[in-house]
Curated annotation (Swiss-Prot):
The protein's name: 6-phosphogluconolactonase
Gene Ontology terms: cellular component: cytosol
UniProt cross-references to PANTHER family, sorted A to Z: 6-PHOSPHOGLUCONOLACTONASE, 6-PHOSPHOGLUCONOLACTONASE-RELATED
Organism placement in taxonomy: Bacteria, Pseudomonadati, Pseudomonadota, Gammaproteobacteria, Enterobacterales
Gene: pgl
Protein role: Catalyzes the hydrolysis of 6-phosphogluconolactone to 6-phosphogluconate.
GO BP term (any one): pentose-phosphate shunt, oxidative branch
Membership in a protein family: Belongs to the cycloisomerase 2 family.
Length: 331
C-alpha cells in the first residue's frame, strides 16, 4: 500500500504533497501553488481526485491524483456560495458538500466523472456552519451550526437536494459550539468535537426508541487547564479503537480509547504538539497521525502505540505558511 499526505497552507497558497513510508517518514513529492487561500481538502472515494476549497474567490478546485506518486494536476473548478470552511463528499462520489462558517450555509455541488460541474442546492440559516458529514449509509448529512449549538439533519435525495429530517436537528449544551464530526466504523455512533468548551459528544444514531441520543459528553482538556478553550479537529482510527481531538490554545492532542461497541470514550492521555493545531489526520494503516501547526508552520508525524493509542513523535517537517488541513490517501 502506498500512502500520500496532502497539507494545505492558506497563507502561502500551497499544497505540499508527501510520500509516507512504512516507517512513518515523509518525503516531499511536490509543492503546488494554488490560485487562492487553500483550506479544506478531501480525497474522492475512488482516490482519483483531490477536492480543495479556496478563497477569497470562493471555489472548489479538483486536482487529478497521479496513481504512481500522488502528485497533483489541476482538472476543474466550480463556484461556491460562501467561503469554504469544510469539504466532504458522499460515499459514491456523486456530490461535494461544503460548509461555510462565514456565510452560514451548506452547499451541494454535483460531480460528473469526478469533476465539479454545477451547484445543486444551498441551505441557509446555519449560523457558524462548520462541517458537513454524511452517514456511512450515505443517507443523512449531519451539519453542525456552531453558533446555534445544534447539529442539523438532512436526508440526501438522489438528485443531491437536502431535505430536513424529522426531527430536523439535535442540540448540544448551551455554549458548546459543535464543529467537526466522525462516525464509528460500526455505524452506530457519531462523535462531535465542540469548539467553545473543548468537549466531545457521543451520539447514538438510533437508540432502542429509534431516536438520536447523546449518550456521553467528555471533557477533552487536562484538569488544571484554565485558559480559553478552542478545540478544532477530531478523527478516529480505521478500526474504531482510538479517537483523537485537538485544542489550539493548549496545542495538544487528546487521546481517547473507544469501547468495543463505540458507546463510551475514556481519556488515555495528552500529547503536546505543534503550535495551534488546526487540523490533523490518521493514515490508513492506523499506525501514524499527522498534525499541522498553524503557528509553527510545520507538520509532525506521530506513531500510534500500544493498547492505549498514545502518540510518539517520529519527525517534524516544514511546510507552507499557516498549515490548516491534512488528508491522507492510500492506493
Amino acid at each position: 500500500m502506498k500512502q500520500t499526505v496532502y497539507t494545505a497552507s492558506p497563507e502561502s497558497q500551497q499544497i505540499h504533497v508527501w510520500s509516507l513510508n512504512h516507517e512513518g517518514t515523509l518525503t516531499l513529492v511536490q509543492v503546488v501553488d494554488v490560485p487562492g487561500q487553500v483550506q479544506p481538502m478531501v480525497v474522492s472515494p475512488d482516490k482519483r481526485y483531490l477536492y480543495v476549497g479556496v478563497r477569497p474567490e470562493f471555489r472548489v478546485l479538483a486536482y487529478r491524483i497521479a496513481p504512481d506518486d500522488g502528485a497533483l494536476t489541476f482538472a476543474a473548478e466550480s463556484a461556491l456560495p460562501g467561503s469554504p470552511t469544510h469539504i466532504s463528499t458522499d460515499h459514491h462520489g456523486r456530490f461535494v458538500f461544503v460548509g461555510s462558517y462565514n456565510a452560514g450555509n451548506v452547499s451541494v455541488t454535483r460531480l460528473q466523472d469526478g469533476l465539479p460541474v454545477e451547484l445543486v442546492d444551498v441551505v441557509e440559516g446555519l449560523d457558524g456552519c462548520h462541517s458537513a458529514n454524511i452517514t456511512p449509509d450515505n443517507r443523512t448529512l449531519w451539519v453542525p451550526a456552531l453558533k446555534q449549538d445544534r447539529i442539523c439533519l438532512f436526508t440526501l435525495s438522489d438528485d443531491g437536494h437536502l431535505v430536513a429530517q424529522e426531527p430536523a436537528e439535535v442540540n448540544t449544551v448551551e455554549g458548546a459550539g459543535p464543529r467537526h464530526m466522525v462516525f464509528h466504523p460500526n455505524r452506530q455512533y457519531a462523535y462531535c468535537v465542540n469548539e467553545l468548551n473543548s468537549s466531545v459528544d457521543v451520539w447514538q444514531l438510533k437508540n432502542p426508541h429509534g431516536e438520536i441520543e447523546c449518550v456521553q459528553t467528555l471533557d477533552m482538556m487536562p484538569a488544571d487547564f484554565s485558559d480559553t478553550r478552542w478545540a478544532a479537529d477530531i478523527h478516529i482510527t480505521p478500526d474504531g479503537r482510538h479517537l483523537y481531538a485537538c485544542d489550539r490554545t493548549a496545542s495538544l492532542i487528546t487521546v481517547f480509547s473507544v469501547s468495543e461497541d463505540g458507546s463510551v470514550l475514556s481519556v488515555e492521555g495528552f500529547q503536546p504538539t505543534e503550535a495551534q493545531p488546526r487540523g490533523f489526520n490518521i493514515d490508513n494503516s492506523r499506525k501514524y497521525l499527522i498534525a499541522a501547526g498553524q503557528k509553527s508552520h510545520h507538520i509532525a508525524v506521530y506513531e500510534i502505540t500500544g493498547t492505549q493509542g498514545l502518540l510518539t513523535e517520529k519527525g517534524r517537517y516544514a511546510v507552507g505558511q499557516g498549515p490548516m488541513w491534512v488528508v491522507v490517501n492510500a492506493y
